[in-house]
Amino acid sequence: MALYLVQHGRARPKSEDPLQGLSEEGAADVRRIAEVAAHYRVRVSVIWHSGKKRGAQTAEILSAALRPPKGVRQIDGINPMDDAVAFARTARVDQDEMIVGHLPFLERLMAYLVVGRSDLPIFRMQNGGIVCLDHYPKTTRPVIRWALMPHVG
């Protein structure tokens, strides 16, 4: 089963929006990435988010393009400073699922899942980007299968 990790889109500064919802550019980046993912027939059963405004907005934009049967849901344990190892040990992914979250949590979760250590950066995420983790034959840990990022360079 694939696990799609998504960093929320670019947010407004706290001075403009205390809840830090998506900026216009951030929402546009997420829409563009969502359209590409839909074109490539990315299918997920559910899209999870942290409950933070920018995460929920990102999840809703992705949901409009990907139409997950179980919709968009909030989940605890994926906020920026939450324990990625604890989350990974308790999470059960039995279908293709997407998690919309925050840094540094997402990069720590990815590192733990792929190499078994959350303190070793293995991929630099971008706001609005998607990383697909999937199992590779004869391995016990997932690998990075592909990534879609709003910006190159």
What is each PLM-predicted segment?
Residues 85-141:
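Active-site-adjacent alpha-helix immediately C-terminal to a catalytic or transition-state-stabilizing loop
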Residues 145-153:
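Short, solvent-exposed aromatic-acidic interface loops
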Residues 2-82, 106-107, 117-118, 124-128, ...:
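Active-site-proximal alpha-helix that buttresses catalytic centers in soluble enzyme cores
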